[in-house]
């Protein structure tokens, strides 16, 4: 168990804002025992228990698509110094076998997800809030590339979800919290140097924040 409450960082951004690379870069600034990451994506309710829309495309971009209680419970457990276990979410990809994820407590806890600011009980736990943003067309092109390669979606499916699920959810559940965040990261380039520099700066600040005071 950790001796003291961890420093909790919330990271959120629109689809295609570069969260995955940002998170990898950020976490890599720390040793494994220094940081823990818990992601909202691993708390999706299985699609076969949701209500399909008329065109049979599921809407994953709603707060009700997440097992909110389990997400909050596991964050609390990590803050109390306990490990948590969760089956990986595979985005309904039948070619992927989900693995069991173990998250162990650490001095820095990163909470990531679209709704982490909207869920009041989770937002209250955060010591720092980081908002990632990319221009809409840039974000859409990134989403198209990812969903073709990783999830086997057609362009028609991706564009439908973008216009009817992704952007409405972003505008309603995330964008209103942008100005309340401690740091807004604009990520309109695919040059990794920008994100590497920003994550280096933030990690340095965090080390200072969690350093025991004499």
Task: Give each language-model segment a name.
Residues 19:
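Conserved lysine of the Walker
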Residues 22:
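Hydrophobic positions on the alpha1 helix immediately C-terminal to the Walker A/P-loop
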């Amino acid at each position: 168990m950790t001796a003291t409450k961890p420093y909790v960082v919330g990271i959120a951004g629109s689809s295609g804002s570069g969260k995955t690379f940002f998170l990898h870069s950020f976490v890599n600034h720390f040793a494994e025992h220094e940081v823990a990451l818990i992601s909202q994506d691993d708390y999706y309710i299985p699609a076969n228990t949701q209500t399909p829309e008329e065109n049979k495309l599921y809407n994953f971009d709603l707060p009700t698509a997440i097992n909110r209680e389990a997400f909050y419970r596991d964050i609390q457990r990590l803050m109390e110094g306990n490990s948590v276990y969760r089956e990986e979410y595979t985005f309904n990809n039948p070619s992927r076998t989900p693995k069991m994820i173990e998250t162990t407590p650490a001095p820095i806890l990163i909470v990531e997800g679209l709704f982490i600011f909207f869920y009041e009980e989770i937002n209250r736990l955060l010591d720092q809030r980081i908002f990632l943003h990319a221009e809409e067309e840039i974000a859409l092109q990134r989403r198209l590339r990812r969903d073709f390669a990783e999830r086997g979606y057609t362009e028609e499916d991706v564009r439908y979800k973008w216009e009817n699920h992704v952007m409405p959810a972003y505008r309603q559940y995330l964008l209103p919290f942008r100005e309340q965040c401690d740091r807004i990261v604009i990520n309109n380039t695919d040059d990794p140097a920008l994100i590497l520099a920003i994550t280096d700066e933030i990690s340095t600040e965090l080390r200072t924040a969690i350093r025991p005071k004499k």
